[in-house]
């Protein structure tokens, strides 16, 4: 799965969970711009695991991560599990 596919899945998940228009989201969009707190972010990351079929080794996210940062984390964890 490439970066753009992961980003599109994240945007769809954010739309489903929080009602945010996917067209208003891009890679630079941050957690605070979406309007979710850190607990909701962790909950969403668990949904990402389920949706994409892998398990995060670590969910070490910086404060207020962008969607690009989350995509990077997803790609790293998916690559480790496919190796």
Predicted regions and their residues:
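Phosphopantetheine-dependent thiolation modules in NRPS/PKS and related acyl-activating systems
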Residues: 2-34, 39-45, 50-83
